[in-house]
Amino acid sequence: MKFIKIKNTIVNVAEIKLIYTHDQLLYIECTDIVHRFDFGTEIGAMEELNRIYKQLE
């Protein structure tokens, strides 16, 4: 399994397991398409999505 650490909150996801650690960092297991991130702006969300998919390649 591949986990990616993200310091922001994720909302409205499809087939993604969310794991919160004691320091409140968020790990996601990507098993499907992420529909929307809540990073304050849509541009920030798209940049974060692009960064994640590059890590998954």
Predicted feature residues:
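Acidic, Ser/Thr- and proline-rich intrinsically disordered linker/docking segments
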Residues: 2-7, 15-57
